Amino acid sequence: MGKVILVTGVSRGIGKSIVDVLFSLDKDTVVYGVARSEAPLKKLKEKYGDRFFYVVGDITEDSVLKQLVNAAVKGHGKIDSLVANAGVLEPVQNVNEIDVNAWKKLYDINFFSIVSLVGIALPELKKTNGNVVFVSSDACNMYFSSWGAYGSSKAALNHFAMTLANEERQVKAIAVAPGIVDTDMQVNIRENVGPSSMSAEQLKMFRGLKENNQLLDSSVPATVYAKLALHGIPDGVNGQYLSYNDPALADFMP
């Protein structure tokens, strides 16, 4: 049997690319995905058949996470890797306009849902000496105008990766930033939250990246995530936060 891999946020962007790359790299891989929108999940199911299975639901609800884990164990008897990809950017707001409830909602999605999923899946991951790959962001340690909620949630995720790697020796963990990728999030930055909430200088920077064709295709970082999930996280980078193109990850690049 091939690897059995859980991936969150598979309906679009990097998450969908991770699924596509996994199947292109290994014909025996099985993926269990979760997202809120069923239509894109149905398309993946139609494309990949009995290699792809899915759960529709809100990842902030433990019942959905348990359903995902239970489906994989019941269907294929194990979980080899987990790729925690799902996340949101908003609220994008200056510190003078902070809406704490909006921050809490973001943290529920970007951080606490992942902590919960790891906790639920950990007994199965320990059986396979599994891997947990966290999709982080350069915003964790770089300032982007009004991205306090998003950036800090990714910093928390990085620390959780380090904690997991040190406290559970049977499972490896890594947090990897994908670079600036040509996804719907970038469209939202250029057209919505950027004009309304970000500095003119940084909005110009993001628009320039698109105009100059400097945004990454999602398949590039997706390949790194997929290979880490398939081949395992090397001991030398276990518990670390790295960029997708860090020399330590050269063997995982496209």
Curated annotation (Swiss-Prot):
User: Which superkingdom heads the taxonomic lineage of this protein's source?
Assistant: Eukaryota
Positions of NADP(+) binding = 7, 85, 150, 154, 181, 183
Checking Pfam families in the record gives: adh_short
* Gene3D superfamilies, per the entry: NAD(P)-binding Rossmann-like Domain
> Per the UniProt record, which EC number(s) apply here?
1.-.-.-
- Name-wise, this protein is Uncharacterized oxidoreductase YIR035C
One MF term in the entry's GO annotations? oxidoreductase activity, acting on NAD(P)H, oxygen as acceptor
